[in-house]
Amino acid sequence: MITRSLIELIFSAASMERWNDHPRPATFTELGKQAHKMIMAWVIARYESEARGAPVDWTSLIEGGIFEFLHRVVLTDIKPPVFHKLMQNDEQRRKLNSWVADALAFNLHRLSPAFAARFRDFLLSEDESSLERKSLRAAHYLATKWEFDFIYHWSNTKSMFGIEQTRGEISRQINEHRDLRAVEEILAARELPDRDMGLWGFLSLVGQLGFQKRWAQTPRIPQTSVLGHLLFVGMMAYFVSMEIGACPRRRYNNFFGGLLHDLPEVLTRDIISPVKKSVEGLDELIKQYEKQAMEERILPLLPESWRDEIRYFTEDEFSGKIRPAGAKVPVILANDLGEEENRDSLDPIDGRIIEACDKLSAYMEASLSIRLGVAPQALADGKQNLYARFSRSVISGFPMGQLFDYFW
């Protein structure tokens, strides 16, 4: 069972500001950083797998990313230099990690006893040599560096105490991961005149979703970014997938489908539903433009062999689909996926689950702002309309409506 407090914990990361003791050109949040990190980890692990012919345990990578996210959210009050110092001491690290596992035991056990056990094992494990953990660690430092480059550019280095030391430490940590070919290529690409191309161009473009605010024309607190929203949707879709007994490939697709479903918005901005539906045919016109922009500007940044999967995640993103072996185009299903489609070989994805999690995010954004006293009519109407649509929703046997009931 997905508990209310677990959802609130995830969402709270949207209010956790990063670099809040530095001058910043924009607000960086923990939720946005972790989203960027997970997309980077996907790129690094996939590139490394293809370059070396080594398989990726995608369940381990996804859950490892979720575990590290939860760990960081619980320990958010510890500043990074202190946090990393504590992690270097074996005894303190074990005590701290055991405390985090205990703090989340109730919520994670309610979700899945096996998942809670894997969380504890992950935190207490001393083995960090797997491709999955190395990819996550490299992605962590690259996402940190992406943010820090803005901080550094904005700062007067003569006035900002310790900023050169911070810069050097981040560079040192990244250099420790140059044995991963994707990291080497990304770092090399950053220094080229055409650095907007290739993997670095893709990751930099994705990071810019952190600057796009949701409900941009509506007063609301806390403000949330499109980038942070993507991680919330991906994690919730993964948890629902666990609840319905989804096969590994279906869980993979639901997580990364949720994490990447709004990728076209980096080119079109987050256009609110009332605007899309205000003129007949406008929604379809926007979809056509997004598809064209993806083909012309985003997909060329990625290896050709990856592009069909990105299309699978971003086109008809709210439809249930399968991709049987040999099929030239995905098969869009009229109904929810059933047991017959719950097979890795069919590459299934639950678009309706991703849509419900997407709308749950919007519903929570409206509900929380109203609860905090910022309640323009647009938020009240949005909350009411979303609840009316999803309060009784059941998808593939999972009662999505109960998640909306939590925040009414």
Language model segments and positions:
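Alpha-helical, largely C-terminal catalytic domains
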Residues: M1-W408
